[in-house]
Amino acid sequence: MNPITMKLVVDDLILQALREDITFEDVSTASVCPTARPATVELIAKADGIIAGLDVFARTFELLDPQSSVLFDVADGDEVHAGDHVGQVRGDARVLLSGERVALNYLQRMSGIATYTHNMAAALEGTKTVLVDTRKTTPGMRVFEKAAVEIGGGSNHRYNLSTAVMLKDNHIDAAGSVTRAIEMARAHASFTTTVEIECENLGMVREAVEAGADIIMFDNMTHDDMAAAIELIAGRAKTECSGNVDANNIRALADLGVDYISSGALTHSAPILDLSLKHLRLLDGK
């Protein structure tokens, strides 16, 4: 996705979130701020973690009012600690109050994913293994969640169903065999398209190698079977480990020598990073 298309997609998603939250009127804000009043509000970290999504946070306020501005003390990928001043938002008080929740939802979610990814990726230091995400993302949030994974030190697997062939158990059942599934994928997809296949045992791995798969994913295979599979593949395909990956076993999996470890938990299980907008201050002296 090129940068222009990406911006349009992101703007549409943020506007959709704002429409969902505001609908017709922010009745609370309209009650206490019936007219425009210049103000500032402070962005504060309430927990330790990695910041991600600052541009999305700022864009939320800009879409409500182009005159809004945000000054950050940190950049995406920086570590923050509880109590740190992260930035200041300046603009119409009505915009600051009405946009607060949506802006924080994006920033907290993305920062939580970046923090979780950072902690998992740290366990892979010194290995060749790359930590990658999956398509197990929140509907409507994929572009943000995958960006957060990269900010946290991970890499993106395929973005969607159009970007690569991934043959899973049901695809293999539909085709009739591992070999047939790979052959059919090669016949249909462009020669530039990567073909990956999910294997559950050594027999499937052997068949996938012989059929010419580009990447072979070990799905919930035992440690010993994965070691045997890597030896069997002998560099003829890239290898990926998936299933039940956590901070306690990720290093042992990497030490097998797999090229990639994929984890859906990066996006579906990461807790948010607690951040807050505090100390709104009116600047008109009224």
Provide a role label for each language-model segment.
Residues 265-286:
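Short, charged, intrinsically disordered terminal tails
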